[in-house]
């Protein structure tokens, strides 16, 4: 499934605060960029979730966020779909599911004309913060943030965000930077990179400490 992304849809994202214009796709021949170094707490890819299972919810304890996860694909122009409301997030279903080997991506809005979106404070996460993704199988895939970066949309590193780097990663993506009132959109994207640190049955998740 990663080949679909690499070959046809290495994109900058069009998550908007108030507008609807989308940045152009990155050409498929674009030079891959180096992925961030994995966290020292990351687990080996052999411990990744073995079978694909769609994510059903995302929890970010540091931000007091717990939200259902929908499914997103591609628009007709090759850009990535975005959630229909500011309080929703969506998993890019043409990539791996969270916990599998590869880079899973979940997108959400930073805000709207009505106020903050679900990822309004995403940029404030720091390395070591935890992300928990509950899968349809009942498994909870647990991730630790490794880095947070902001990219101008024209320089969005799609291969780095969407491509497989041999580990089980989860990227969260939203808008950020300067808001352009003429176009009605933000000029940058915020990306939170995280690595898988473990899995647990959903029923046992509340018994597992999220922070050391």
Stretches with model-predicted labels:
Residues 1-5:
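N-terminal export and membrane-targeting signals
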Residues 9-212:
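Solvent-exposed, non-transmembrane regions of membrane-associated and secreted proteins
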